[in-house]
UniProtKB/Swiss-Prot annotation:
Cleavable signal peptide: none
EC code(s) of this entry: 2.1.2.3, 3.5.4.10
Gene: purH
Upper classification of the organism: Bacteria, Bacillati, Bacillota, Clostridia, Eubacteriales
Keywords: Hydrolase, Multifunctional enzyme, Purine biosynthesis, Transferase
This protein's GO CC annotations: cytosol
GO molecular function, one term: IMP cyclohydrolase activity
Source organism superkingdom: Bacteria
InterPro entries with a match to the protein in the record: AICAR_Tfase_dup_dom_sf, Cytidine_deaminase-like, MGS-like_dom, MGS-like_dom_sf, PurH-like
Protein name (Swiss-Prot/TrEMBL): Bifunctional purine biosynthesis protein PurH
Catalytic activity: (6R)-10-formyltetrahydrofolate + 5-amino-1-(5-phospho-beta-D-ribosyl)imidazole-4-carboxamide = 5-formamido-1-(5-phospho-D-ribosyl)imidazole-4-carboxamide + (6S)-5,6,7,8-tetrahydrofolate; IMP + H2O = 5-formamido-1-(5-phospho-D-ribosyl)imidazole-4-carboxamide
């Protein structure tokens, strides 16, 4: 009995050459619908699926291969005499190769289609054949990825058959694909109906292996969401090397921080912590303000902009060593300047941050929560003195920055410049002292969480702070309010805490 391959693919790249190869090895081909037509038109001797099933395609193509004469041929164990006896009695031909790629649900779910249109891209017959073939991998070669055509061809050329090791790997690829495919469908169907479902289905596809992880002895890779076109899976690399693991984490924060602001803004960042943040009339002004606050820490840093980068800004940036620049666009002459630094990673972003959930792994579990996308609940002035309009503008600026600083976090600012940033401390007074020491001339102070004691207010007064913004909610809020009144400082509560761990 001749060996037989069943080919049914949506993506036809490479399938014609692969089919020709199979035919050259005396393997007959069965196919369906559009694949059958494509192979036939290109001179391949191919059997249409309904010649096997004696049953026509029906329901607008929804039912083509869902038939015992197909699946028995895939699932029969060749060494099982009873299985083979049934096939012989029923005149069922074994299927030795299953070549299937799926309807592009991953792509279509992100397009501007109706719910019903997206549902039509949920593949049923394809996954069923793939799963059957993958289960019976000892006897069936299953190909779900066009990149594996050459792998199979090479083994058949060299060894006359596909090794059990390779068949098992191809089987694993199928179930890996199906878990992502089914996960994407589950998330699509559940939508907002169940915010935290019983089973967490995450669907990500590998973008690339990374040179190493957070440290050189750790291996790493980066995966892209199949459901969402976010900032970090759609950017273009215009210059420089591939991003490292640490680059990915840092760029994410720099881009998010810069995009907190409506006006032109720049965020300079090192080790996942902002070291300079400023707004200005344009990218150049914002960058220079951020740079001048801390020209030491910015060295080797990540720079995020929310506006196009011009030549003047580029000329300033290439004066120092930087790892990455992230912006929505670049003038041509600016790009020419930046490309003089061959290792400088220059990224063009197409999407503003849009994540609604974030996940963190702990040993044996994953924590899932809403992204911290809300800045304030409401502004409530709690002191005798009210902040001026300029102070209020700076207070909101400071709160936008402090969101991105590791807790406990304090930011002091003036005129749209984060003059002092203190964070990552186990009490609140230390980051206050750090921020004030660096932030000479600051007039406002922003805190990511409430004050447990009045000591922060007293320190702020010593440092010349005129207004404070914090979430409120401490049992001793009144002590801090009284301290502000004593020092003539305005203070507002926001109702929202911004811990970052």
């Amino acid at each position: 009995m001749k060996k037989r391959a069943l080919i049914s693919v949506f993506n036809k790249d490479g399938v014609l050459d692969f089919a020709k190869f199979l035919v050259s090895k005396d393997i007959e081909i069965v196919s369906t619908g559009g694949t059958y037509k494509y192979l036939k038109e290109n001179g391949i001797d191919v059997i249409e699926i309904n010649e096997v099933t004696n049953f026509p395609e029906m329901l607008d193509g929804r039912v083509k291969t869902l038939h015992p004469l197909v699946h028995a041929g895939i699932l029969a164990i060749r060494d099982n005499k009873e299985h083979m006896k049934v096939l012989e009695e029923r005149e069922i031909h074994t299927i030795d190769y299953v070549v299937v790629n799926l309807y592009p649900f991953f792509e279509k779910v992100k397009e501007d289609l109706t719910f019903e249109e997206k549902v039509e891209f949920i593949d049923i017959g394809g996954p069923t054949m793939l799963r059957a073939a993958a289960k019976n991998f000892q006897d069936v070669v299953v190909i779900s990825n066009i990149n594996d055509y050459e792998v199979v061809k090479s083994e058949i050329k060299n060894d006359g058959q596909v090794s059990l090791k390779t068949k098992k790997k191809l089987s694993g690829k199928v179930f890996n694909l199906m878990s992502a495919y089914d996960g994407a469908i589950a998330n699509f169907m559940l939508g907002d109906e169940e915010e935290y479902p019983e089973y967490l289905s995450v669907s990500y596809k590998k973008m690339q292996n990374l040179r190493y992880g957070e440290n050189s002895h750790q291996s790493a890779a980066v995966y892209s969401s199949t459901m969402v076109d976010g900032a970090m899976n759609t950017f273009e690399t215009l210059n420089g090397k591939e991003l490292s693991y640490n680059n990915f984490k840092d760029v994410d924060i720099a881009w998010k921080c810069a995009n907190e602001f409506d006006e032109p803004a720049c965020c300079a960042l090192k080790h996942n912590t902002p070291c300079g943040v400023a707004t200005g009339e344009n990218s150049y002004e914002a960058y220079m303000k951020a740079y001048e606050v801390d020209p030491t820490s910015i060295f080797g840093g990540i720079i995020g902009f929310n506006r196009k980068v011009d030549k003047k800004t580029a000329q300033e940036m290439v004066k120092i060593f930087l790892e990455v620049i992230a912006a929505p666009d670049y003038d041509e002459d600016a790009l020419e300047v930046l490309k003089t630094k061959k290792n400088l990673r220059v990224l063009k972003f197409h999407n503003t941050p849009k994540a609604e959930k974030c996940m963190v792994t702990v040993d044996g579990a994953i924590l899932v929560q809403d992204e911290d996308n809300k800045l304030i609940d409401e502004i409530k002035v709690v002191t005798e003195k009210k902040p001026s309009d300029e102070e209020m503008k700076d207070l909101l600026f400071g709160m936008k920055v402090v969101k991105y600083v590791k807790s406990n976090a304090i930011v002091v600012a003036h005129n749209g410049i984060a003059l002092g940033i203190g964070g990552g401390q186990v009490n609140r007074i230390w980051p206050t002292e750090d921020a004030l020491r660096r932030g000479k001339g600051a007039t406002i102070l922003a805190s990511d969480a409430f004050f447990p004691f009045r000591d922060v207010v007293d320190k702020a007064a010593e440092g010349g702070i005129k207004a404070i913004i914090q979430p409120g909610g401490s049992m001793r809020d009144q002590e801090s309010i009284d301290a502000c009144n004593e020092h003539g400082i305005a203070m507002v509560f926001t109702g929202f805490r911004h811990f970052k761990h």
